[in-house]
Design a protein with these regions (language model features):
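Classical nucleotidyltransferase
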Residues: 1-29
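Acidic-residue sensor for enzyme active/binding pockets
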Residues: 46, 65, 117
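A generic "binding-loop/recognition-motif" signal
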Residues: 53, 62-63, 101-102, 111, ...
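Glycine- and acidic-residue-biased ligand/ion/polar-headgroup-sensing regions
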Residues: 62-81
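Short acidic-glycine-tyrosine-enriched beta hairpin
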Residues: 80-102
């Protein structure tokens, strides 16, 4: 026998499935990201940096990025060589990364770091291809 209205309405009972369908995870060695929204001149992403992991040192020609830490802790390494600065982010902190600025996000704790990242730039150029990486020690 099939029973209706058990466990909430249909949208509530399958919301986890809809969330995974609308914004699947892209797995990386440092954790994962999800594309959440693309608007005119901006893109919103969720980044999760796993414990004791770092993204690559990178910069972008066509976009700036605003990183908003929503849980956990993270270090943002900005610049290279003698101009390198390390910013520690805790809950609700944010950092603006300008176009062309070298940066690398790291999580040196035992809990995941959750970041909401906002890209700003020309909509057509807001892609994962807009990246230059270098190896750092």
């Amino acid at each position: 026998k099939f029973v209706f209205n058990v466990g909430g309405d249909k949208t509530e009972s399958s919301s986890w499935l809809l969330d995974k369908w609308k914004s699947p995870k892209t797995i990386r060695k440092w954790g994962y990201y999800k594309d959440l929204y693309l608007g005119e001149g901006f893109k919103v992403k969720e980044l999760v940096i796993e414990p004791f992991s770092c993204l690559s040192m990178q910069r972008h020609e066509h976009r700036s990025e605003l990183w908003n830490l929503v849980s956990g802790s993270a270090e943002i390494h900005m610049g290279i060589g003698e101009e390198k600065m390390i910013y520690e982010l805790n809950n609700n902190a944010s950092v603006l990364i300008e176009k062309g600025e070298w940066h690398m996000g790291c999580n040196m704790t035992d809990k995941p770091a959750h970041i909401v990242e906002i890209w700003r730039g020309n909509t057509e150029e807001l892609t994962e291809k807009d990246i230059e990486r270098i190896q750092v020690d």
